[in-house]
Amino acid sequence: MHMKSVFYLFVFTPFLLFSQSNWQQNADYKMSVDVNVKTFAFKGSQEIVYANNSPDTITKVYYHLYFNAFKPGSQMDVRSLNISDPDRRVKDRISKLTKSEEGNLSVFELKQDGKELVFEQQETVLLARLNKILLPGKKTKLTLLFNGVVPKQIRRSGRNNKDGVALSMTQWFPKLAEYDFEGWHPNPYIAREFHGVWGNYDVKITLDKNYILGGTGYLQNPNEIG
């Protein structure tokens, strides 16, 4: 049986109070994740305290599920196959992924303040309509369970890259979409840049003790993991 190490990370993002004409949403995350280094799979739980600092009433939320782009036939794959100047790291490589090489990110049991939400997932975007509307200046708690698989490396994320990194994981968790003065930004992922909500991240990661975890934030339990 493999021994596992548990890493606690806390990432702080400065949050300022804004006037109604200059506001910004805030999402504070707590996540607990188990990583299987043999199968490249991971599973976890997530809690978000979402603050509506906008002058608008929020009736729904969107999440990004980026790893689902790394499957044959995805919007990212189709775009790369049909544009005249595809990213040379991508080209037709997604279309050639086998089932065991694909990425995945799936959500289940999504709740708002303890009550289950109905949601729909379409490739890299998830939509959930709130049971309780979120008024300006108010907060709500969103909780979910998720699982995923790290894909073969195509761009930045992936398995066993040429530098010897076993698991490169970026944008790997269900990520709440941004809401700003233009409204929601639930853009499907097609290998463009990311747009997200400011907030704090409190993350617990459990994996094989023989692996070294690198990341941003502040390690909370250095004495426990050596």
Where do the protein language model's features map onto the residues?
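Beta-strand-rich interaction surfaces with strong enrichment in secreted/lumenal proteins
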Residues: 20, 31-34, 48, 115-118, ...
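Bacterial Sec-dependent N-terminal signal peptides
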Residues: 1-23
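Short Pro-Gly-centered flexible turn/kink motifs
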Residues: 135-145
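Extended, low-hydrophobicity, Ser/Thr/Pro/Gly-biased non-transmembrane segments
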Residues: 86-104, 108-112, 145-226
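Short strand-edge motifs at loop-to-beta-strand transitions and within beta-strands
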Residues: 124-128, 140
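N-terminal, polar/Ser/Thr-rich
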Residues: 17-43
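Asparagine-centered strand-capping/turn motif at beta-strand->loop junctions
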Residues: 50-54
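Short aromatic-acidic-glycine turn motif
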Residues: 67-77, 211-214
